[in-house]
Each structure stands twice: as structure tokens, then as C-alpha cells.
UniProtKB/Swiss-Prot annotation:
Gene3D superfamilies: alpha/beta hydrolase. The gene is frsA. The keyword NADP does not apply. Belongs to the FrsA family. The lineage of its organism: Bacteria, Pseudomonadati, Pseudomonadota, Gammaproteobacteria, Enterobacterales. Catalyzes the hydrolysis of esters. It holds the Pfam family FrsA-like. This is Esterase FrsA. Keywords: Hydrolase, Serine esterase. GO terms for molecular function: carboxylesterase activity.
Amino acid sequence: MTQANLSETLFKPRFKHPETSTLVRRFNPGTQPAVQSTLDGKTVPHWYRMINRLMWIWRGIDAREILEVQARIVMSEADRTDSELYDTVVGYRGGNWIYEWATQAMVWQQKATQEPDQTLSGQHWLHAANLYSIAAYPHLKGDDLAEQAQALANRAYEEAAQRLPCNMREIEFPIPGGASVTGFLHMPPGEGPFPTVLMCGGLDSLQIDYYSLFERYFAPKGIAMLTLDMPSIGFSSKWKLTQDSSLLHQHALKALENIPWVDHTRVAAFGFRFGANVAVRLAYLESSRLKAVACLGPVVHALLSDPQRQASVPEMYLDVLASRLGMHDASDEALRVELNRYSLKTQGLLGRRCPTPMMSGFWKNDPFSPEEESRLITSSSLDGKLLEIPFSPVYQNFDKGLKEITRWITQRLC
């Protein structure tokens, strides 16, 4: 089936699709707090979703393109589930968030199929994959249209992989007691086996969102990167997130000794946001398999255990947490109780001495991850390093922080 036909088949109207903001039923919706963070973007009045412009630009989307798509959504006069929120247009049509971003992705998909130069075609496919991923954002369970956009994002990424200079392999990992999961191994030029970083992403992202991390930071150092979707999204959608948050990544980590392109004696884990929960858990449970663990803006305790902090983050992020836990219609109190069980301190891990070297980067006044969170991680390690990243200028400091983390990982792997 051609890519164009796949798009038509997937998005063919069958019934009234649920609108994203209605999928998680909040019992006590409060006022939307004003939030701005490097990794998550910011709350913008009249938008349900956090607008994560920095990360979208970092992934290769042009700022003007973002504004153009947003403008189309704002200008729509179609019915909305909440007349105050632009991105709540009902149904797959003009003005709907998923429709507009997927339509933009199809423009790049078309360019990719018509481009004779393989590398350029690969870049266009990658661009399309990123746009399809934004269409599916924030990847809530039960969002039929978003899940279809995810399928197109993964398909476009596979097409990009065949054309881009980096060597990429799709690897299936069997998981006892359930469906296998698929990861992407990104390899730098040269002969393997390579030292490898296991990437653990945030709960509101797909594994394909981190290609820039490999291309700009790890590949130049001769380091491979293995990605895996977090439980309940993408290729891991058949798995619910549980208190054993590192289950899928742990099985992938154990399987690395059987993968010829990976030097399984030189492996590190890197966690963004809740992905740090997975990475730090692995630092304790699999210290013999990991040379190092790095975190950025980690979510390992404070947000999971402090009701005040939970009240200070945007509605969309709480919806993401509830969705990952399979608690779409739970009371706020029930959600709070359940979230506390995911704290690595509550689980009795963090605070105990850990032999794995751990580094954690943080921003001052980060609503999702206070400085104490990173201090808790680094002080628990026998070889801990704390990295403060100044907020402004945002893009340059984000890049500088990633370079510092890459340097630290490289020293421990190479």
C-alpha cells in the first residue's frame, strides 16, 4: 500500500471520533496555571495543549511552519467541545489539531516521494514523521485519530531510515507475559559493535522524537542510540504503565548482549522527564549492565508525591499521567494516591546508595522537576554529578546542557 493510500485509509471517516481534550474526565478542573519550561513548552491562553515550540524547532520544524498551522486552527469556525479553547475542534476536518498537523505532514510526505536525491528525500520523510508526531500529541490513550497519526509517524520514520546516512535498524524485543515491543537502533558511521545509549523519553512523546539527539550529539562521538516507546504509546501501546515503570526498557537492556552491533559492556541510559524514572530505576536494578545514567528535568519523586506541585502543572500534563496509568475517569484523589506509588523514593530506591554513576540536569524553578529532585538522584550515587542549566537564552542553554551530558556519558562509555 502506498503512503498516500495508507493516509486515506487510516483517516477515512467511520464514526464521530472523540475530541482529545475530552478523553480524560477531570473531576476538579481548576484554573489553568501559567507554566513555562524548556522541555515541555508553555501554557498559552485558549489552548488545551502546551505549545512546545522549542522542542519542535529542535526536532527540525520551522518556527513559521508552527505559526501557520496554529493560525489555521485559530481561524476555524467549526464546532469545538470548548468554545474557549482553539484546539478542541470536533472531528477530522479543518481546524482540528490532528487534521491540520497531519495535513502539513502530507505536504512533506509528497515532497519526499518526489525528491530524487535520497538523503534529501530522507530528510523530508523525517520532517513528515515529526509533524505526524505533533499531530498525535499528547498521545492520549483512546484518541483514535491520534493513534492513526502515530502509525503514519512511525511509517514515515521507517521510510526516512532507509534514506538517511545513519544506519538504523528496527529491533523487536520479546516481553514475557505480553506483546513484544519494537525499538530503533541508530548507529554512527564505522564498524560496530558500538557503545550505546538507551534513550528513555517523556510520557508525552514518541521514540521517534529523539533523532536530533542522536544526529547532533551521540553520532559525532561514535555512540549508538537505542530508542523504545514508553508503555501505553506507539509501539508499546499494548502495555500499561505500572509501578515497575522500567519493565520494557529492562528487557531491552538485557537483550543487548545478543545484538551484534551493540557493545553490551558499554551501555548508558538517558532519561528525559518521566523517562528519568525509568533510567534511575535501571541504575538500581541493573547496575551491572549500565556504565552510567543521565537525567534531564527528572520526574522521580516530587511531582508524583506532592499534591501542591500537581496542582501547579497544566491540565494536559495531568491528563497524560492519568492516561498512561489507565485512569481516564478516576477522581483527582485516586490519581494522587496512585501517582505516589510511582515515586522512586516511596518505592525505597532513591535515597539508597547506588553504584551506578548518575548525572542530573535541572532548571531553577522548573514546575515539573525542582532542584531537590536532581540533588536526590546525584547524592544517591557513589559517583554523582549535578548540572544546573540556566533558563535563558533557552535554545543555546539547552544545547549546551546536552553537550555537557554527552561529554559526561562519553567519558564513561569510551
